[in-house]
Amino acid sequence: MGTPWRKRKGIAGPGLPNLSCALVLCLSRSQPRTQVGTMSPAIALAFLPLVVTLLVRYRHYFRLLVGTVLLRSLRDCLSGLRIEERAFSYVLTHALPGDPGHILTTLDHWSSHCEYLSHMGPVKGQILMRLVEEKAPACVLELGTYCGYSTLLIAQALPPGGRLLTVERDPRTAAVAEKLIRLAGFDEHMVELIVGSSEEVIPCLRTQYQLSRADLVLLIHRPRCYLRDLQLLEAHALLPAGATVLADHVLFPGAPRFLQYAKSCGRYRCRLYHTGLPDFPAIKDGIAQLTYAGPG
């Protein structure tokens, strides 16, 4: 990306093998020679400007794909560690124990300069912390702990005596988050990590975890599960009137069914904070803020 397009050796040029001719020969077995031989090069040339335009226009998405899928998978195989585990090793050697702010800054630096972490990031983080401080919730439920980044943001902003329950479905990821949370200085009485899928945990919150109401909920796991989990919270009467539900990644990768439900059911006041992805500001995303009016 960003470099001039050049002809590849072997594609065109006098005296050089033409790869398109090989394609023509293969296709000519099933199609008339005159039709294939005259149309294939023309079609290829016609589509070339379109391909180049798409690559330029969506270069940020291409970089994200390479960084989060291809390079990450390669590093996972070579190191035997997941990206969250590599990030935690970096935190251990560069961050100050007991200082959640410094740990968060260290994770931001890791994501910007080492490997993209797919975390909430500082811009969205400021929105989250401001809302937690503003609402002063007695109990917060987070669905999707991941590496623990947003968990630390919430824990920092909780009022005295506040409680945070955070749910992570992957045991290996949860183990990393648990160590990060304790490294930051938050004990189990303040921040409790539950390992399990949100679909299984939500129905058990009242009986097994003594959570009768969640004043603030953060949805930050899989956007396609947001609507299901919101309806589960409603069905089990875990949202009091006035409760705040925050949902990340509602624009990218997007949660259209969740947003449509929140806007049309008549039980929520909705607001959308437009942001970009951390380290990819050109890719537009947003945080949805829902205020629950009650079951009526």
UniProtKB/Swiss-Prot annotation:
EC main group: transferase
Matches recorded under CDD domains: AdoMet_MTases (cd02440)
Keyword tags: Catecholamine metabolism, Cytoplasm, Deafness, Endoplasmic reticulum, Hearing, Membrane, Methyltransferase, Neurotransmitter degradation, S-adenosyl-L-methionine, Transferase, Transmembrane, Transmembrane helix
One Pfam family here: Methyltransf_3
Record-listed S-adenosyl-L-methionine binding positions: 142, 144-145, 150, 168, 198
Keyword S-adenosyl-L-methionine: yes
Recorded GO CC terms: apical part of cell; cytoplasm; endoplasmic reticulum; membrane
GO terms for MF: catechol O-methyltransferase activity
Biological role stated in the UniProt entry: Catalyzes the O-methylation, and thereby the inactivation, of catecholamine neurotransmitters and catechol hormones. Required for auditory function. Component of the cochlear hair cell's mechanotransduction (MET) machinery. Involved in the assembly of the asymmetric tip-link MET complex. Required for transportation of TMC1 and TMC2 proteins into the mechanically sensitive stereocilia of the hair cells. The function in MET is independent of the enzymatic activity.
Oligomeric and partner information: Interacts with LHFPL5, PCDH15, TMC1, TMC2 and TMIE. Interacts directly with TMC1. The interaction of TOMT with TMC1 and TMC2 is required for the transportation of TMC1/2 into the stereocilia of hair cells.
Record's miscellaneous remark: LRRC51 and TOMT were originally considered as alternative reading frames, LRTOMT1 and LRTOMT2 of the same LRTOMT gene in primates.
Protein family membership: Belongs to the class I-like SAM-binding methyltransferase superfamily. Cation-dependent O-methyltransferase family.
Name the record gives this protein: Transmembrane O-methyltransferase
Origin organism lineage: Eukaryota, Metazoa, Chordata, Craniata, Vertebrata
Gene behind the chain: TOMT
